[in-house]
A protein has these predicted regions:
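Short hydrophobic/Thr-rich beta-strand motif most characteristic of the beta2 strand and flanking loop
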Residues: 26-33, 41
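Acidic catalytic/metal-coordinating carboxylates
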Residues: 33-37, 60-63
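Short amphipathic alpha-helix used as the core "switch/output" element in two-component signaling
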Residues: 40, 62-74
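Active-site residues of response regulator receiver
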Residues: 53
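Receiver (REC) domain active-site loop signature in two-component systems and cognate sites
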Residues: 56
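Alpha4 helix (beta4-alpha4-beta5 surface) of REC/receiver domains from two-component response regulators
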Residues: 63, 84-104, 111, 115
């Protein structure tokens, strides 16, 4: 299916894994390791979809979502967070309130993220917002 995806995450290993998964699925990928760079790249590259972590140094994902939703044609957004079960769920709920099209709790399967992304770009939701899992790989 493809499309252009901007991935924003301060975890270099996860950023690499997500980039590879999207590239293998036929997406063009732009990556940023913090919210400030992500906002700048979103403006320069006009992605179809932004996948952003919530808890990051510099500008958090919440700030990035706010900024990206203020442009004339905002991208679709998937917010991800692994900030503990209760706190992570609060962050994801707030991200949804601010305009994230979908949310996904860490840990997640890359195939799940790619499938959700394809659905969001196509204009639907893969499934109701995903709540934190109780076990890795769940």
């Amino acid at each position: 299916m493809g499309g252009r995806v901007l991935i924003i995450d301060d975890d270099p290993a996860l950023l690499r894994l997500m980039s590879m998964a999207f590239q293998q699925a036929g997406f063009g990928v732009v990556a940023a390791d913090n919210g400030r760079k992500g906002i700048r790249l979103a403006s320069a590259h006009r992605p179809d979809l932004v996948v952003t972590d919530i808890v990051m140094p510099d500008i958090e994902g919440i700030g990035a979502i706010r900024a990206m939703k203020q442009v004339a044609r905002p991208p679709k957004i998937i917010a991800i967070s692994g900030a503990g079960r209760a706190r992570g769920a609060d962050y994801l709920s707030w991200a949804k309130h601010l305009g994230a099209d979908e949310v996904l709790a860490k840990p997640f399967r890359m195939s799940e993220l790619v499938k959700m992304s394809q659905s969001v770009i196509a204009g639907g939701a893969a499934h109701p917002s995903v709540q934190p899992q109780t076990a890795l790989g769940g």
